[in-house]
Amino acid sequence: MGFFKGLSSRPTPKQVAKDRLKLILIHDRGEIPTDTLEKIRKEILGVISKYIEIQVDDVEISVNKSEDMEGENTSALIASIPIKSIRR
């Protein structure tokens, strides 16, 4: 069955989630609009909840801005997602 795994042109859910999280790591000096941040939150929670039961009411997502060693402004999306249990 491992042979057929490489023939699929569709990305795995794991790869989709990884790609989405990469996109969220923002290298932008501008602010993220509230509605965009909410869309990101819903999409991340949708993907994660397929594999893990989470406490949706206690999820915290924020954007932290800092300066890197070269003096560039960087932004990072920080997510705190409490886990109830892992789906098997």
Curated annotation (Swiss-Prot):
The keyword Plastid does not apply. The keyword Cell cycle applies. It comes from the Bacteria. Pfam families: MinE. InterPro entries: MinE, MinE_sf. GO terms for biological process: cell division; regulation of division septum assembly. Signal peptide: none annotated. NCBIfam families: minE. HAMAP family: MinE. Prevents the cell division inhibition by proteins MinC and MinD at internal division sites while permitting inhibition at polar sites. This ensures cell division at the proper site by restricting the formation of a division septum at the midpoint of the long axis of the cell. Belongs to the MinE family. This is Cell division topological specificity factor. It comes from Clostridium botulinum (strain Eklund 17B / Type B).
